[in-house]
From Swiss-Prot:
Gene3D superfamilies, sorted: 3.30.70.260
Name by which UniProt lists this protein: UPF0250 protein PSPTO_4820
GO CC annotation: cytosol
Domain of life: Bacteria
Entry similarity comment: Belongs to the UPF0250 family.
Alphabetized Pfam families for the sequence: DUF493 (PF04359)
SUPFAM superfamilies with a match to the protein in the record: YbeD/HP0495-like
Lineage: Bacteria, Pseudomonadati, Pseudomonadota, Gammaproteobacteria, Pseudomonadales
Natural source organism: Pseudomonas syringae pv. tomato (strain ATCC BAA-871 / DC3000)
Amino acid sequence: MTDTDIKSHKIEFPCVDYPIKVIGDTSAGFTAAVMEVLEKHAQVDAKTLAERQSSNGKYTTVQLHIIATSEDQLRDINSALRATGFVHMVL
């Protein structure tokens, strides 16, 4: 991959339909904790919310779209989600 290829894959801000996928332990407060963090840091499109459990029920995936305004905002979201203690991965 060349430098040109890498630069062409950068996100252009603002990105009005930025997908966020959060994977964490299944618990009663997981989705609410994810939504609370996201709503604190970004404008969230709640209509895009999708929630799915793993086949054994141990993990839950929450997926939705936000309006992403900067790389700093995305880093802050990632840090805040991980700080909840529920989250294993943010994609």
